[in-house]
A protein has these predicted regions:
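Active-site neighborhood of phospho(di)ester-bond hydrolases with catalytic His/Asp-centered motifs
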Residues: 1, 19-25, 53-54, 68-73, ...
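Core catalytic region of metal-dependent phosphoesterases/phosphodiesterases
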Residues: 1-47
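Histidine (H) residue identity feature
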Residues: 8, 26-31, 55, 59, ...
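Short, flexible, glycine/charge-rich loop motifs used to bind or transfer phosphoryl groups or to couple energy/partner
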Residues: 9-12, 43-44, 55-62, 92
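Short, conserved active-site loop motifs that form the nucleotide-linked donor/cofactor pocket
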Residues: 19, 36-40, 51, 67, ...
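Binuclear metal-dependent phosphoesterase catalytic core
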Residues: 47-49, 59-68, 74-123
């Protein structure tokens, strides 16, 4: 769900629970001050119970630091293993299979129904 139009921010008051926004590529950062009137905080990434919460999937070189990367952005939920340049300079190093550590929670893919962390960990 995008936060690009501040005219709908008031609807956030209708939601129960803590509201923390992880900004994405469609969110307008110049509206952050206004958004903070309706949510607890705004972040680019959150480390929660060893899980990395982001808008877009994190780089495969970073996934080993987390239990899961819970993200959206990939609306078709199609990630693939890739070769990458490790941050230590090794060329063409094949990453260990890690797709099971990426969980896409795009609103459309999860039928607009929230999932608990336990549900995501057990999928």
């Amino acid at each position: 769900v995008t936060m690009e139009s501040k005219e709908h921010y008031y609807k956030l008051d209708q939601l129960n629970g803590r509201k923390i926004v992880v900004m994405g590529n469609h969110d307008l950062h110049q509206h952050t001050k206004e958004l903070l009137n309706y949510v607890e905080s705004v972040a680019g990434m959150i480390d929660y119970k060893g899980c990395c919460l982001t808008h877009a999937p994190i780089h495969p070189a970073e996934i080993s630091f987390y239990r899961l990367n819970i993200h959206a952005h990939i609306h078709e939920n199609k990630l693939q293993e890739i070769e990458y340049l490790s941050r230590y300079g090794d060329l063409g190093e094949k990453v260990e299979p890690t797709l099971h550590k990426y969980k896409c929670v795009d609103a459309k893919l999860i039928d607009f129904k929230p999932k608990t962390l336990e549900e995501l960990l057990n999928e």
